[in-house]
Amino acid sequence: MKALRFAEFGPPSVLRIEEVAIPEPGEGEALVHVKAAAINPSDIGNVSGRFKDTTLPRTPGRDFAGVVVKGRQDEGEEVWGSAPMLGIVRDGSHAEYVVVPAATLSPKPKPLSMAQAAAIGVPYITAWASVVSAAQIQPGETILIVGAAGAVGQAATQIANWKQAHVIGAGTQSGPIPGTEAVINTRTEDLRESVLGLTAGRGVDAVFNTVGGTTFEPALQSLRSGGRQVVISSAGEPRVSFNLIDFYHNSSRLLGVDSYGLTPQQIAEIEGQLRPGFETGVLKLAPIEIVPFEKAAEAYSRVAARQAKAKQVLSFDWPDGTRGNSEDGMSA
């Protein structure tokens, strides 16, 4: 089979397409014939050497959609999924076949194409684990999403809307963000003061922070009494400081979420919760760009340089080897 491989850490130019043996599933595992696989920013970080647990040589990739070939009673089923440590200590989904824990697989949402289903993965699983599982957002509550324009932020906004919560978006962009009731430009506006102004001085019930770094403390100060902040990343400086007295006087709560640490069972449960949202159209994917597998390194380069205009999804069913086919969020 063909697989995208890297034997050293570095830029996307270290990636090579190689012929390797089709893997065999072990106990509790399934072999999936990959039809499409998304590229996430974390895949770029993995190839560059950002993750200390990655062993070489390795096939990257976390998200995929395909057909079960071996290892489960429902062989032939169309599935989608993402697996813990996939592409880190076990070969990932950027290959024609991938072996994953069978428990992580979920039936593909019927309205979605393989390429669209492959694009759900990390953004929506991370968003659900943060907004629903960790923050436990409730109907009528207000949540501040820092980095609302990003892939995980957009997923979180839709999930919060689905849960009947009010969303305030924040980030470095200007202009409206779908699903938000207000947007704060953190380059030109004071985050805390803006939030207090939008909430009549009360603060928000929860913060989902996809950025961290310099946004951490003002986001923490934006919470109401008893509010909670969920953090999944730290852009720039990994260390932050905050007023501990204010923190405990406000009865604030701080939670971290790492999607790499989710168990196969947790991933499967989240996938099952997400499926009705996509099947009913409540959740909608952002546009994707389908790229033939042979041009995987080029797609990686676009993501690394932040030049991709849509989610990059590798396809193994490309008819002519050209690039440029796009799908909107819910086209079949």
Question: Positions of the model-derived regions?
Answer:
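Short amphipathic alpha-helix with an adjacent loop that forms part of the alpha/beta core around
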Residues: L191-G201
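N-terminal Rossmann-like NAD(P) cofactor-binding module of classical short-chain dehydrogenase/reductase
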Residues: W80, V207-F208
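Mid-domain Rossmann-like dinucleotide-binding core that forms the NAD(H)/NADP(H) cofactor-binding site
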Residues: A118-E189
